[in-house]
C-alpha cells in the first residue's frame, strides 16, 4: 500500500514556526553525531524539522506563530537576525582574507573566534525546544547543534595541524552559505514577508552545499586521524580506576562510517521536501 503525503506550502510552514530551531538538518545539517553533517541536514536543509512537523499551508504557519506569543516571536526574530548577521560577518571575513592573502592558509585562525561564538550560541536552539517556543524535539535539536559543535571544538579547534587543510575551507563555505540562507529564511518567515528568492535558495542551494559540506567534514576528520592516533588525544586507556576505555581514533572512524548510510537517505529525503515546497507535488511513498 502507498501513503499519500500532501505537499508543504510555499510560505515556509513548519520551518517558520521552528525558526530559531535547528538544525537537520545535516545536516546538515550539519556536522552531526554520529554522522556529523549528515543527520543535521535532515532537518536544517529541508526545513521540515527532520519531518517532525510540516505545515499544510501558510495559514497553519500563521496560526502556529500566534500561539508562540508576542514575546517569543520577538525573541525568535531577534535571534535569527543576529545569527544571519553573524554568519554574514563570517562570509565577509573569509572573502576579505582570501582577497588580501591570496591563500586559504591561516583562514581558519583568522575567523575562528567568530565561528566558535556563533556556532556555540546555537545552543540556545536546544533551550528554545525545552521551553516550547519551537516545535522541534529536544533530541533532534540536541543532535543537530552538538554535532556542529563537535566538528568545531573537538576536531578543528583541538587538532591544530589540520586547520590549514583545504577541506576545512570546504565545510566552512558550505556552512556559511547554508546558515545565511537558513536564518534569513526563518527571519522573513516570522515577519510574514518571505521573498521568493530566499525560499528558492533555501530549497535549492543544499543540492550543492550539502555534498560539499559533507565532503569537507569527512576529509577534515580523515586528515585528523594520524595526529589523533599518534597522540592518543581524548582517549582513555586501561587500566584506570574507573575500568573504562575510550579510543578517540576509532570513534572518529565510526563517525566517518556513519555517513555511508545516512548521506544518501537524507539527501534524497531533502530532494523530496524540495519538490513538495517549490512545486506543490503530492509524493507517494511506498511502505515496505
Swiss-Prot record:
The keyword Lyase appears for this protein? yes
Pathway assignment: Lipid metabolism; fatty acid biosynthesis
Keyword Transmembrane carried by entry: yes
| Top-level EC class | lyase
UniProtKB keywords: Developmental protein, Endoplasmic reticulum, Fatty acid biosynthesis, Fatty acid metabolism, Glycoprotein, Lipid biosynthesis, Lipid metabolism, Lyase, Membrane, Transmembrane, Transmembrane helix
Which GO cellular component terms are attached?
A: endoplasmic reticulum; endoplasmic reticulum membrane
A family per Pfam: PTPLA
Enumerate the Gene Ontology biological process terms. fatty acid elongation; sphingolipid biosynthetic process; very long-chain fatty acid biosynthetic process
Q: Which reaction does it catalyse?
A: a very-long-chain (3R)-3-hydroxyacyl-CoA = a very-long-chain (2E)-enoyl-CoA + H2O; (3R)-hydroxyhexadecanoyl-CoA = (2E)-hexadecenoyl-CoA + H2O; (3R)-hydroxyoctadecanoyl-CoA = (2E)-octadecenoyl-CoA + H2O; (3R)-hydroxyeicosanoyl-CoA = (2E)-eicosenoyl-CoA + H2O
The UniProt entry lists the main location of this chain as endoplasmic reticulum
Query: What are its E.C. numbers?
Result: 4.2.1.134
| Region Disordered, annotated ranges | 1-59
Please give the name of this protein.
Very-long-chain (3R)-3-hydroxyacyl-CoA dehydratase 1
Amino acid at each position: 500500500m502507498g501513503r499519500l503525503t500532501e505537499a508543504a506550502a510555499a510560505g515556509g510552514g513548519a520551518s517558520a514556526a521552528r525558526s530559531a530551531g535547528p538544525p537537520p538538518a545535516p545536516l546538515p545539517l550539519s556536522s552531526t553525531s554520529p554522522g556529523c553533517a549528515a543527520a543535521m541536514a535532515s532537518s536544517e536543509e529541508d526545513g521540515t524539522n527532520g519531518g517532525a512537523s510540516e505545515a499544510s499551508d501558510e495559514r497553519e504557519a500563521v496560526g502556529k506563530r500566534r500561539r508562540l506569543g508576542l514575546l517569543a516571536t520577538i525573541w525568535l526574530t531577534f535571534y535569527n537576525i543576529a545569527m544571519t548577521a553573524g554568519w554574514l560577518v563570517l562570509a565577509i571575513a573569509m572573502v576579505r582574507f582570501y582577497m588580501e592573502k591570496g591563500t586559504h592558509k591561516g583562514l581558519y585562525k583568522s575567523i575562528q573566534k567568530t565561528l566558535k561564538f556563533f556556532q556555540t550560541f546555537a545552543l540556545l536552539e536546544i533551550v528554545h525546544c525545552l521551553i516550547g517556543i519551537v516545535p522541534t524535539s529536544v533530541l533532534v535539536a540536541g543532535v543537530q547543534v552538538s554535532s556542529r559543535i563537535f566538528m568545531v571544538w573537538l576536531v578543528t579547534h583541538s587538532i591544530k595541524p589540520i586547520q590549514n587543510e583545504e577541506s576545512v575551507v570546504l565545510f566552512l563555505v558550505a556552512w556559511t552559505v547554508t546558515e545565511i540562507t537558513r536564518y534569513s529564511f526563518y527571519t522573513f518567515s516570522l515577519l510574514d514577508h518571505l521573498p521568493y528568492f530566499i525560499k528558492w535558495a533555501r530549497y535549492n542551494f543544499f543540492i550543492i552545499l550539502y555534498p560539499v559540506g559533507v565532503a569537507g567534514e569527512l576529509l577534515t576528520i580523515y586528515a585528523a586521524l594520524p595526529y589523533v592516533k599518534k597522540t592518543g588525544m581524548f582517549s582513555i586507556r586501561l587500566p584506570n580506576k574507573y575500568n573504562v576505555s575510550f579510543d578517540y581514533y576509532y570513534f572518529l572512524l565510526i563517525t566517518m562510517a556513519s555517513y555511508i548510510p545516512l548521506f544518501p537517505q537524507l539527501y534524497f529525503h531533502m530532494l523530496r521536501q524540495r519538490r513538495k515546497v517549490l512545486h506543490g507535488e503530492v509524493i507517494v511513498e511506498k511502505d515496505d
